[in-house]
Amino acid sequence: MAMFRNLVASSQHRQHHSHQSLATPSSADSLETQFGCPICLEVYYKPVAIGSCGHTFCGECLQPCLQVSSPLCPLCRMPFDPKKVDKASNVDKQLSSYKAPCRGCSKKVTLAKMRAHISSCPKVQEQMANCPKFVPVLPTSQPIPSNIPNRSTFVCPYCGARNLDQQELVKHCMENHRNDPNKVVCPICSAMPWGDPSYKSANFLQHLLHRHKFSYDTFVDYSIDEEAALQAALALSLSEN
């Protein structure tokens, strides 16, 4: 799950009509609230703003909404013109100006670098390792899983870079391994119940871009087979837009 989630959990309820006129934050909490993307719940990355309602999101987070014929704002559900989505330059500038303490090591980091810092902070990794074990909300006759696979972060199959979420993995591979001819195992597919950890994709980058445009965790029932899961995920993803 998003590592910045605990910092900005209430952000989707407290965004102003437009982030283009953000007031100067007075505390770390207000920084976290004002600069948290309502979709991924992490600090903004390449923020963009919807012209009609002014709501701001990470550019990559908003992309799926731009692929449908009648897009709706993910926050207020108002229709908007995809041609009137612009880079939130003022927000981007402030991300490089303001600092907030890391919730792991307390080091003050500019918000523009917060994602990278959290992904490599030993204290944060230690906290994540000590997260409570899975416990059902209500009593159940079903067996409690003892080893739930990590489907939140992945390792680059080319260079071994760790702690990459799905979007970060795609971005990392496109920027660093675009011309790598090696056949590699898709770490996202191999984490699925139906995945084959020994199958190597002949064109991994094309596979990433076409097969992993959405997050399986959001839409998929892992008890069904791969094709049914893919079709269900696509249908639900489109219906939410």
UniProtKB/Swiss-Prot annotation:
Keywords: Cytoplasm, Metal-binding, Transferase, Ubl conjugation pathway, Zinc, Zinc-finger
PROSITE patterns: UIM, ZF_C2HC_RNF, ZF_RING_1, ZF_RING_2
Enzyme class, broadest EC rank: transferase
Keyword Zinc included in the entry's annotation: yes
Pathway the protein contributes to: Protein modification; protein ubiquitination
Gene Ontology molecular functions: ubiquitin protein ligase activity; zinc ion binding
A biological-process GO annotation: ubiquitin-dependent protein catabolic process
Compartments, record wording: Cytoplasm
Matching Pfam families: zf-C3HC4_2, zf-Di19, zf_C2HC_14
Major site of localization recorded for this protein: cytoplasm
Region entry Disordered, spans: 8-30
Protein origin, superkingdom: Eukaryota
CDD domains named in the record: RING-HC_RNF166
Domain spans labelled UIM: 225-241
Zinc finger (C2HC RNF-type): 102-121
Residues that bind Zn(2+): C102, C105, H117, C121
Keyword ATP-binding on entry: no
Zn finger (RING-type) start-end: 37-77
UniProt catalytic activity: S-ubiquitinyl-[E2 ubiquitin-conjugating enzyme]-L-cysteine + [acceptor protein]-L-lysine = [E2 ubiquitin-conjugating enzyme]-L-cysteine + N(6)-ubiquitinyl-[acceptor protein]-L-lysine
SUPFAM superfamilies noted in UniProt: RING/U-box
Protein's job: E3 ubiquitin-protein ligase that promotes the ubiquitination of different substrates.
PANTHER family according to UniProt: E3 UBIQUITIN-PROTEIN LIGASE RNF166, ZINC FINGER, RING/FYVE/PHD-TYPE
Protein name as it appears in the record: E3 ubiquitin-protein ligase RNF166
Gene that encodes the chain: rnf166
